[in-house]
């Protein structure tokens, strides 16, 4: 039997390698997306079965007889032993936000091959390792947060600085995720109704699994899934009824307050009551759509229309995002391969809910592989589109304009022939008014889903349904990361406040938790609301910093794990974390340096990427406009009454331009300052890690004492 298993695993590996090589080496012919789906499945299965288990049992030594914090601290609020399937769902729902949907779509401008390689290789060797090991070290330290662990294991000063940096990054990430949800649900009664219905459904599931039928996860799953499908179905009916639709139609500022209230309340409720069952419910939809997409691709067999490698954009001149393939492809893909945000979840809610140590492999490593699979689906959705359509959707109006004929002409001149009629027909098929410059990645993913699923379910008549269903799916996909992120940031704030006044750091204290939640929601809520009322303010100011800061956080997390492995006497296994850490940090710090370079004449890409250069150009443009206004005012004094009206209008237009440029200048200066702070923090963690690994810095290991699970169970009985 063992021989047969080895033969089976060998053929799985061989199949995955064959498909991977075919995608990499094929030239000049159309390539089916089937090869990427098969290759990804094989690589993930082999990665989990061999590399994941190697790390779990050879490197760190998971012990099923060792009690977890959830068992020891079980308080029914934050520390709750949770079924591993339910906890996997929570972890996946919490980490799988906008990143795996948006990043690969944007990166597709460079072709499918570079993104495919990084998503698959990075996901297995970097991202899944990162999530799993951070979950492990937090579990072994009573579920402590990332910043607190850096403080304990790498020194007070390093930890204190890191805690501030991590909190800043966390606020940026939550506000960005919330903004994506607000934009998706604004004036969308179908989407808002469906997402609103998941709240009572999740609460019912939580009560059902804890009190009505304890442990009956399967029963609750079936009931919850049926109710979810009904809410999706009736959400469409609600959107078609003017009276009902009115109650679920809100603008962005109102939705911003609603999301803040949602995040505030959900972070205070017991995890078994709402957070865990809601994430479990959301995972049904998330995983369901991804699995259906995988089978649909195998059935429809769409071809990649995007080139394997878009050589003309490797230098960073692409219309979708600026920056060369290294480092900005890796920074742009972000969560699809590795994400620092995951470390915050893996050291926030999840380690406090693990029922058994051995579940950490499935929850940590497995959930990241699932997210990497989502990124692969997003990449496929982008690359099966006609390149002309892809660039019409993802290029800014500043590049292609708002006129259909002009946009088609510009894109065709780039080498991707597309006609206005083709764009018009697709726009009509999905029931939209325009698809030009629908940037951000989400509409492109929705288009890809539509083009695949309509060939199996419903035909052309159902393209509008599938498009709007995909938009709804993305909103639900992302919202789960907001509530988990808020709860995690609450723990982080309590860690910081606990250093000032110890009782505030007690996570069992209701009032301390309430204060921390208010601070958390106030911070990310401010940026969210400002972004909702001003397209140039709030979170839009910090948005460009997301990619670099997120990857820096991932690098810092891997360095922390490396330092702990060295203290555990596992130096021979340091390559497991140091190899991905070194690659991620080189790419990220190089990208960070490019973002703070000064203006250079003729260096178009550098000036576009750099916050400092952009701020300098903003200042120069403001000075020019101020001089022009002074000149116009001088002319106005000597002009007729009729000309004065004309001059006044010109002055108002230029003052508005100055206002917009001032917003941009402030945002870029703030981004540059924060980027420098995050890079200095990263360098501080690097120095501490090196010192610990070579024995120059001696800080004792702060692992929690061993508690035997069987003895604990006997005492509790």
Give residue spans per PLM region.
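Selective recognition of specific alpha-helical transmembrane segments in multi-pass small-molecule
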Residues: 42-52, 166, 173, 231, ...
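Extracellular loop-to-transmembrane helix junctions
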Residues: 30-49, 107-137, 147, 192-198, ...
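Low-complexity, proline/glycine-enriched hydrophobic segments characteristic of transmembrane helices
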Residues: 240-241, 386-454, 536-537, 592-666
